[in-house]
Structure formats: C-alpha cells, structure tokens
Amino acid sequence: MAATGTEAKDLENHHNDCFIQLSNPNIAAMKEDVLYHFNLSTSTHDFPAMFGDVKFVCVGGSSSRMNTFIKYVAAELGLDHPGKEYPNICAGTDRYAMYKAGPVLSVSHGMGIPSIGIMLHELIKMLYHARCSNITIIRIGTSGGIGLEPGSVVITQQAVNECFKPEFEQIVLGKRVIRNTNLDAQLVQELVQCSSDLNEFPMVVGNTMCTLDFYEGQGRLDGALCSYTEKDKQSYLRAAHAAGVRNIEMESSVFATMCSACGLKAAVVCVTLLDRLQGDQINTPHDVLVEYQQRPQRLVGHFIKKSLGRA
C-alpha cells in the first residue's frame, strides 16, 4: 500500500536525520558500555528514554555555570516553573555535572584538553546509545582576548594550535596523530545572526587558539615559570592576531576535532575577560565578570529559542 503524504514526509525526514557516527567498531560488540566518569551505564540506564529527545547540547567548564545555564534556557523556553529543580544526572560522581531541560542538555567539562576530551568520549557515546539525531553542540565559555574589548564575544571560525595551525595533535600508541579542527560554517553564521538580533554586546568571528596551559602556554608573565620577556610575549600575541586569532582558551581544538569526526554540528562561543595585549591578570570586579559570563549563555539561549521557533 502506498504511503500517505504525512507518512511519506515522515519517512523523508527520517532519511534526512543525521545520527551520531562513532569511529570505533569495538563499541557495537560490547554487551555493556560503562560511562565511568558520568556514573552511567547502558545496562543500568535507559539512554533512549533519558536522552532520546535531546537536540541541543551545551558544554562549559564550570558545573555551577552549566546549572545556571539550564535554569536560564528552561525559563526562556517556557519549561520552568517556581520551585522546579534540575537534578545533576551525574550525581554519583564529582568529575562532571549534567542537567537536562526538554531538548537541551547542559554538561560541565572541567578545564583543559584532557578533561573535556574524556567528557566528550562519554558524552558522544551516550548520545549514540540514546539514538539521538540532528544534534547541535556548542561550547560556551570564557577566554582571553587579543586586541578586543573585555566582554566581547568571539564566535570561533577555526580552532588553531599554538603555532596557529588548524590541527589537533595527539599521541596514540606512541605515534603522532593529527586531525583537523573543522567547525560548522553555517552554524557560525546562524550564531552571528542571533548576536545581531540581540545587539547587546560586541561580537566578532575569529580564530580561537587552544593551548595546553594557562600560563607559559599562553605567553603569560605571571606564572611560577617564565623563560621569555614582555617583548617576546607581545611579538607572539601580535603574530597570533595577524594569523586571525582573536581569543585564547584550552578546549576548542579537541572539541572541534571530536565533534567533526562524529558528525556533530558544533560551534564555540566564548566571552573575553581581558585583552592579553594589555595584561595577564584578571582583576575585573566580580559582578562585571558574572555579567560577561552570561553573554554566551544569552546568545546561545536565543539561538535555541529561534531554532525551536520560540523567539
């Protein structure tokens, strides 16, 4: 019997769905997959029931910040009500925190490439086991700017390494493996439009340099170790700026690499807390920093509302 118009459309939409692509044939043969750092397992949790409706995943370093974000986005989407709580789904561990409101998942990733890398392995597998499709994942965070007014929001065009190359290098079984750091260009433009819609703060699109360290790795002069001069630092940061780098953080390269490899549409949106050409230490008043940190949340919250037709 021929399909009805509605059935045919549903079938077409199903064929157009973009599912998670694990680049690991071993997973399919496993009877149980323990996501140790989330305190979740395929044998003890029903992932499709828990996460099957997720369409937007937002990740950030701080667990408290991601808890604040889920409350904010829930209110924006009309999912909140007085007294509503958003329990930590990973409450059995203190490594990461995870919160959910409707189609939005909010997950903390800690600080630096190793921490976010571990989280992403388990998050991507979790979404795969939940049979999620058409996922958009966005890192929202803080960074140091280069030549930007503090409080500016940078939407990452390309994640680059300390030599300004769009590469992520990892040692695997004693060998160097280099992968690209591609992000979704269309998603960048959608976020740019959302920033224009809001028109609340300075925004730029630029490259984001991802480093392994907060101090020497970012050319700071105020760490316990420093083997270079102020002149050396300025020369390096100006070279980075000339290469299109507008901010510096410690997670974007592995985030871009892993999301791209697994078929996830991904973006990075970070606020700058200072201009590194002007100094190294963050001495902005606390209340100002809190407002700065809300800027990526407001931008991404508006993007989610707009994507769901609720803006």
Curated annotation (Swiss-Prot):
PTM note: The N-terminus is blocked.
Taxonomy, superkingdom: Eukaryota
Presence of the UniProt keyword Nuclease in the record: no
Annotated control of activity: Strongly inhibited by 2,2'-anhydro-5-ethyluridine, a competitive inhibitor.
Family matches, as InterPro entries: Nucleoside_phosphorylase_CS, Nucleoside_phosphorylase_d, Nucleoside_phosphorylase_sf, Uridine_phosphorylase_euk
Residues that coordinate or bind uridine: 143-144, 218-220
Pathway recorded for this protein: Pyrimidine metabolism; UMP biosynthesis via salvage pathway; uracil from uridine (phosphorylase route): step 1/1
A GO cellular component entry from the record: cytosol
GO terms for MF: deoxyuridine phosphorylase activity; identical protein binding; thymidine phosphorylase activity; uridine phosphorylase activity
EC number: 2.4.2.3
Subunit relationships: Homodimer.
Function text: Catalyzes the reversible phosphorylytic cleavage of uridine to uracil and ribose-1-phosphate which can then be utilized as carbon and energy sources or in the rescue of pyrimidine bases for nucleotide synthesis. Shows broad substrate specificity and can also accept deoxyuridine and other analogous compounds.
Family named by the database record: Belongs to the PNP/UDP phosphorylase family.
This protein's name: Uridine phosphorylase 1
Species the sequence originates in: Mus musculus (Mouse)
